[in-house]
Amino acid sequence: MDRAIQSPGKYVQGADALQRLGDYLKPLADSWLVIADKFVLGFAEDTIRQSLSKAGLAMDIVAFNGECSQGEVDRLCQLATQNGRSAIVGIGGGKTLDTAKAVAFFQKVPVAVAPTIASTDAPCSALSVLYTDEGEFDRYLMLPTNPALVVVDTAIVARAPARLLAAGIGDALATWFEARAASRSSAATMAGGPATQTALNLARFCYDTLLEEGEKAMLAVQAQVVTPALERIVEANTYLSGVGFESGGVAAAHAVHNGLTAVAETHHFYHGEKVAFGVLVQLALENASNAEMQEVMSLCHAVGLPITLAQLDITEDIPTKMRAVAELACAPGETIHNMPGGVTVEQVYGALLVADQLGQHFLEF
């Protein structure tokens, strides 16, 4: 079977990179629709406008309405068509970037993204998640290509809430363990076919970077400063994890995250916070070594990620709720079926309870 790997056309990262955005956009197109968070425009609109103007680029800067819905995509497509814009750039959080990618897909033009937080690995992916105008999940929009350009301004990331960086570490934490599991079962990745050795090595390097730099990066972002550790964690959260999950494979950890959405108490937690607990559940499913479990729990605890159900605000009626989580995690088509040998609802239910107990024991010592 053929193997494949995919990634953005170009990845740029550095302090104050947004000031140089126009230079990076210029080779792609000379007329841009800029879609940005209202919050981002509040502190960066002048920087964006000056950067593109200095590069000789025409632009319209529009505020994202807050929901990545088909209605919002259609509105922005109409603006791009009316003004003859030949490329799209999204600046802000995940929904803004997903919207920009979707608009570019329907307009059949290049897309660039500039994430202002490092809370997930989504910016580099060939995927947009669409919701209804009311905020309910609608569908996945699988895109034919990854963004042509990803630009991350680490000075902006450093000023974002520290919890967002921790959530990105939680999302990135799954990359190696899910890629390892998917590789063992020869599961097809989003790139097509089993993982390449390059993708697996990127996934492993992502995990090693989190272990080495995670706690130091959290201290940096708490102080709102850019350090070498923060630079490396931003790259791990955004690029290494982005390429790693898409071309390395996904397995139980993200399926457990999806299962946890069945429990109302978890709805206010970030994606990566729930994924981090999903990693512990996957390791319990795999009967991972005590050393590996301790290593993962130590990292999670150091950066403020949950390792028990109580830390996800699940404290009552646990057996019933975990049964619902296990059933949803094992739904047909879920990525948990990429686990070697397959898994059952009973096995996932047991792993959820064991992971919680392991986390509790860790916190006692």
UniProtKB/Swiss-Prot annotation:
InterPro entries this protein is in? Answer: ADH_Fe/GldA, ADH_Fe_CS, Glycerol_DH
Q: What is its EC number?
A: 1.1.1.6
Which residues are involved in binding glycerol?
Answer: D121, H254
Residue numbers binding Zn(2+): D171, H254, H271
What does the entry's cofactor note say about binding and number?
Binds 1 zinc ion per subunit.
Q: Does the keyword Metal-binding apply?
A: yes
Q: Does the keyword RNA-binding apply?
A: no
Catalysis performed (reactions): glycerol + NAD(+) = dihydroxyacetone + NADH + H(+)
- What EC class does the entry list? oxidoreductase
Q: Could you say which residues bind NAD(+) here? A: D37, G94, K95, T116, S119, S125, L127, Y131
| Pathways involved | Polyol metabolism; glycerol fermentation; glycerone phosphate from glycerol (oxidative route): step 1/2
Please indicate which superkingdom the organism of origin belongs to: Bacteria
List cellular component terms (GO): cytosol
Enumerate the PROSITE patterns for this protein. ADH_IRON_1, ADH_IRON_2
Which UniProt keyword terms apply here? Glycerol metabolism, Metal-binding, NAD, Oxidoreductase, Plasmid, Zinc
Q: Could you cite one Gene Ontology molecular function of this protein?
A: metal ion binding
Listed cofactors: Zn(2+)
Q: Which GO terms describe its biological process?
A: anaerobic glycerol catabolic process
Q: Which NCBIfam families match?
A: PRK09423.1
Describe its function. Catalyzes the NAD-dependent oxidation of glycerol to dihydroxyacetone (glycerone). Allows microorganisms to utilize glycerol as a source of carbon under anaerobic conditions.
The record's annotation in PANTHER family points to: GLYCEROL DEHYDROGENASE, GLYCEROL DEHYDROGENASE 1
Name the family: Belongs to the iron-containing alcohol dehydrogenase family.
> What is the protein's name according to its record?
Glycerol dehydrogenase
